Amino acid sequence: MKVDLNADLGEGCVHDRALLRLVSSANIACGFHAGDAQTMLQSVRWALESNVAIGAHPGFADRENFGRSPRHLPSETLYAQVVYQVGALKALAEGEGGKLVHVKPHGALYNQAAKDPALADAIALAVRAVDPALILVGLANSESIRAGERHGLTTRQEVFADRAYQSDGSLVARGQPGALVESDEQAIRQTLTMVQKGQVQSLSGEWVKVQADSICLHGDGPHALDFAHRLRQAFSLQGIDVSSS
């Protein structure tokens, strides 16, 4: 059994380079919600150094709220913004002798696309326009995955180690009680259950089916590196390999 382990990079976290040694895929901020040309280039170089798959992490142009506030943009505007961000990172990766492998939207863009077919379509079309070989990463069982499949993209269904789930398979919104899984032990148990059994227990107690192709690790917490090490150890004990391919 194998699973992809991904982390967001280029968002100002101090653990980026060390975290890359523990994951198989990196989602690099593309300058709208965080980062700039220099951080994008540095993140690409670190990913190549660690032999980690390079992914674009486009978001809304909303630095003030770190791309986490909902926005309602015309489809054409969103399409252009995603093409712009993904295309820029693709050029930087190729300039360093690397390759852009996947695209994972950030924050509110990710969460809105998970529920909004029109928004999900705009993202999928933008990704396909840049390179139809790119993998689209989205919340398991979401509109993002369905849009990717509609438009002929390879998709990767993602689950979260440290986030709580609603009974419909969506994430509990940040700021709501219980949104974050605070205990490392609980987060590891939840992750193993999602990977091995294809299900997760929602905040209200129901079991929800999920397909865990990739697991997101958040690198911005105070114990991010320690948790990543512990999760890798748990995978090793269970015979689960970490790989982006």
Curated annotation (Swiss-Prot):
For this protein, what is the EC number?
Answer: 3.5.2.9
Enumerate the GO terms in the molecular function aspect.
5-oxoprolinase (ATP-hydrolyzing) activity; ATP binding
Q: Which reaction does it catalyse?
A: 5-oxo-L-proline + ATP + 2 H2O = L-glutamate + ADP + phosphate + H(+)
> Which SUPFAM superfamilies does the entry mention?
Glycoside hydrolase/deacetylase
What start-end ranges are recorded for coiled-coil regions in this protein?
A: none
- What does the record list as GO biological process? carbohydrate metabolic process
* Keywords recorded for this protein, A-Z: ATP-binding, Hydrolase, Nucleotide-binding
A Pfam family cross-referenced in the UniProt record is LamB_YcsF
Q: Which CDD domains match?
A: LamB_YcsF_YbgL_like (cd10800)
InterPro entries to which the protein is assigned, alphabetical? Glyco_hydro/deAcase_b/a-brl (IPR011330), LamB/YcsF/PxpA-like (IPR005501)
The family note in this entry says: Belongs to the LamB/PxpA family.
> Assembly state and interactors?
Forms a complex composed of PxpA, PxpB and PxpC.
Q: What does this protein do?
A: Catalyzes the cleavage of 5-oxoproline to form L-glutamate coupled to the hydrolysis of ATP to ADP and inorganic phosphate.
- Protein name as catalogued: 5-oxoprolinase subunit A
Annotated organism of origin? Erwinia tasmaniensis (strain DSM 17950 / CFBP 7177 / CIP 109463 / NCPPB 4357 / Et1/99)
